[in-house]
Every structure is written in C-alpha cells, then in structure tokens.
C-alpha cells in the first residue's frame, strides 16, 4: 500500500493546472446510459473513481474509448472519453462493482428510465456517515417506479414508463437531484423538482442533458422543471473545473505561504470558500483563466465556518480548512451540517500537534505555533488531503499511509505540488 512522504516548510510558488471535476464527471458518464448514441466528455480527470465507473458501465455493455486530452494538459492529467451505450446487455449493477463507489448507485436512474428496470446493489464508498439512498428512491417512486429491496439489491421497475410528477426533497440532496434529472428527462410529461441542489455539478449535468435533447429549465435554482422527451441523442461536453481541487490548493498556499496561480478554473464556482480564505488574510484574485492565491508574512487569522449546500461553504473543503486553522492566530469554530461522522481527520491532525476539541457537529480549533511531522493514516478522501496540507507546513517529515483515498479524487497531486516547490514523494510499497 503506497505512502506519501512530505518534508514541510517550503512555500509554494508557480502554477497548478486544475483538473475536471470528478463530482461532475461521474454523473455525466452515468448519463451516457440514457442514449444509444455516443456521448463525448472532455476534461475527464484520471482518477481511480473514474476507472471504477468505466468498469461498472462496461459491465452494462457500454463501450468506451479514450481519444486524447485538451491542449495544455500534461501526460498525467485530463482525458477525453467517448461512451456509447448502444448495446446494453445487463441492467444489473453487482455488489462487487457498486461497493467500490457510492455514486455508481446513480445508474439506477438511466437504466430505469430507458429500459424500464434496474437491479442495483446498495452502495459503498467513503465511510463518512450513512448517506442513505432513501431520497433517491423516493424520487424514482414519485415518477412511477416500484421499488423492492431483495438480498442487498434495489430492484426498480416500471410497467409503462416513468411519468412526470412533483418531487419535493425534504432536504437538499445532490445525488437525489442528479437521479431525478436523469430519470425525468425520459419521463412522460412534466417533472418539477423542488428544493433541488444548486451545485455547479448539477448545472453541468443539466447542460449536458440539454445538449442531448432534454428540456430543462431552472438548473442552479431550488426549482427545476423538466419536460420529458421520448429519446435523447449524443453530445459533446467538457467537464467543468474541479472547485474542490481549486479550494484545496488555495488552502495549501494559505498554509505554506507563497504565490500560486490556479489555472483552468473559475472563482464563481466557490465564492464562499474564497471569501472565507480572504478573511484569513490570504490574498485571492480572480483572473480570466484562473485564480491567484498569495500569502506573505504573518500566518492566517482564525475564522469560523459552517458547511452548507451550495452556494455555502462546501463540506468537501471542511477538512482542508480545518488543517489551515490548526496554525491560525486564535480560535476557529467549524460546524459540519451536511454529513455526520466527518471529523475523522481530527485524530490524525492531533498527531501532528493540532489542538482540536469536538462538541457534536462542532470542531473548536485552537491555532498552534508549529506542527511537527509524524506518521498519519488517511481515513477518507477529503481527510487524506487535509493531512497533506498540514504536512506541507509541519516541521520535519510527515508520512501519510493509505493514500489510495487520494487517488480516488486528486489527479497527479504529488506532481502538481512538487512543481511548485513542495518536498513530496510517493513510496510504492
């Protein structure tokens, strides 16, 4: 199992290219099941989760071809993938594949909408709370599906196709909104999705579905209206930049000091996080094709944050921000409102010398003058990268174990950081 070694203390200087968003690419790839024509996706990151989903889609009979990368991308970043679901042979998604990644459960929507049935194993993936699929199944039932649980599998069927309906989510759910959008695109009649997720990744999916022939209005607002169509066609779409990767590297610069341009990204994708970062004393400047992040002199100031659905502070940046606050001047209070059990990184940050106290969904962080390198263990995707950020600023060597979590969500992380001066290397074991 690979390990990452970091010798901290070096400020970051240079440019970091931002990859396409994994959280956008996954539903876009799944949406290829809605049509027998080819869907071409550009700027798809090279990640373990992408490879896992390609295996899952291949199990259904989807053909895929990697056709290249866009100009300016390095050998280890970015790819264009063509997906063709013209010969779907199986509407069952087995446990051994779905258990590797929760998002793969979303195949239930296009399989049900296009073929009238789907048998999908209950999901696996990150161990950060229960993440129940109840809201996703509720959306399917509202559209006329019958749902049964049989031996750990969700079996969804519809006799005469899905029918438009009003779907009111009791709480904001990104996965539920993705599933509802895909299913409603091929449902008969009008579907109204209320309390819809407003995340940029939802908008990206809606834009791709529209290119395929779907009729969608209101994506990016709490109310989305979908007029179902009888069939969808192929399309070409470029995956939007990864706002979580953008915020992660921005916080790394704030942690170490330095001056870095984050290229091929957009400030409007994460205004809340960038505003918080600016409040810490970090200089953040929007550029035509990216964001400049600079911090010189004194360390950052402590700032309180609460995670919220978009456009609020992203839960997927909570662990990274906590790492930054471990060396801040003063006390920071970080409240997690999206997922329970998302403070698993606290114990590992404490091994580096962080002072953090947990009170239910609240983490109270008292900044310390210095962190010291130590062996630590990655527990999930976002927690693992928070340890990287802390290690970049710790005295001595930090060794991060179980870094396969990083490979699920961060493309070429060591290469991007080392080009900016970080002393970071991977040990293959």
From Swiss-Prot:
Gene3D superfamilies: Enolpyruvate transferase domain
Subcellular location per the Swiss-Prot or TrEMBL entry: Cytoplasm
Pfam families to which the protein is assigned, alphabetical: EPSP_synthase (PF00275)
GO cellular component terms, A-Z: cytoplasm
EC number: 2.5.1.7
Modified residues (2-(S-cysteinyl)pyruvic acid O-phosphothioketal): 126
Record keywords: Cell cycle, Cell division, Cell shape, Cell wall biogenesis/degradation, Cytoplasm, Peptidoglycan synthesis, Pyruvate, Transferase
Positions of the catalytic residues: 126
GO biological process: cell division; cell wall organization; peptidoglycan biosynthetic process; regulation of cell shape; UDP-N-acetylgalactosamine biosynthetic process
Claim: Cell wall biogenesis/degradation is one of the keywords in the record: yes
Amino-acid positions noted as binding phosphoenolpyruvate in the UniProt annotation, renumbered to this chain: 22-23
Pathway(s) where this gene product acts: Cell wall biogenesis; peptidoglycan biosynthesis
Catalysed reactions, semicolon-separated: phosphoenolpyruvate + UDP-N-acetyl-alpha-D-glucosamine = UDP-N-acetyl-3-O-(1-carboxyvinyl)-alpha-D-glucosamine + phosphate
Residues the entry annotates as binding UDP-N-acetyl-alpha-D-glucosamine: 102, 131-135, 316, 338
Keyword Cell cycle found: yes
GO molecular function, one term: UDP-N-acetylglucosamine 1-carboxyvinyltransferase activity
HAMAP family, sorted: MurA
Protein family membership: Belongs to the EPSP synthase family. MurA subfamily.
UniProt function note: Cell wall formation. Adds enolpyruvyl to UDP-N-acetylglucosamine.
Record's protein name: UDP-N-acetylglucosamine 1-carboxyvinyltransferase
Lineage: Bacteria, Pseudomonadati, Pseudomonadota, Alphaproteobacteria, Hyphomicrobiales
